[in-house]
Amino acid sequence: METSTSFWSTLDSWRARRAAVFGKWFMIYFWTQIFMIILAFLSSLRLVNGMPADLLVLLSYGYSVTEVVIFYQLGRQEDRFKTSAGLALIALVAGIIIQLLHSEVLAGLWRIPGRIINLIALYHFMIGCAEILLTTDGKLSDKWRSLWKWYIDLRVGAIVGIPVFLIVANIFKSILVVNLGVILMIGIAIALIVVAILWLVYLYRTARCFQQIGKTLESSPGSDAN
């Protein structure tokens, strides 16, 4: 009986530590995303044009380094995040090398592989979120999977649809075709904005979910998480 009690106490302690790690780093990642959105917004309003270009580059790489660290910390608990960390690190190192060499040729050659690597890293992150939530919040887990499907469909739609539209518009030179293409692009842009908002909402909810689980397990009788 004592052995059984000790086993469940140890299991709860492990689950509490795991939840605490997820709660902490998902919340850090959420606020990191908010910071980058604010920076991008200010940049679009030309409010940061007075800042040195090198500082903006440094902030961008600082974000990338932070992202690698976050993925690594999450990866210590779940392998999919470890994969995301490795891919993000590859993208970061490649970006630094290209920046140091000031090579437009390398930048052009890296553009497509870089996007593919980022897409795969994002896949492992989002599916990783779905998997770790499967036994704690099934609805949120399903939402992460749906969000990935929406995102990849929209990205493929943008990559394939826009070139096809340009070719068709060039062939037929029709105002109707042009208008339909513009509507298509606006629709995709709006949908991607919605996906980005949902990404932030799900990220915050995931962080809060694990923070609550960690607190519950730490305060439960027999837990030695503290």
Roles of regions detected by a PLM:
Residues 1-43, 60-101, 113-164, 195-226:
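Membrane-interface extramembranous regions at the lipid-water interface
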Residues 40-59, 100-119, 169-188:
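Membrane-helix interface and helix-disruption motif detector
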Residues 183-199:
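Small-residue-rich transmembrane alpha-helices that serve as helix-helix interface/gating elements
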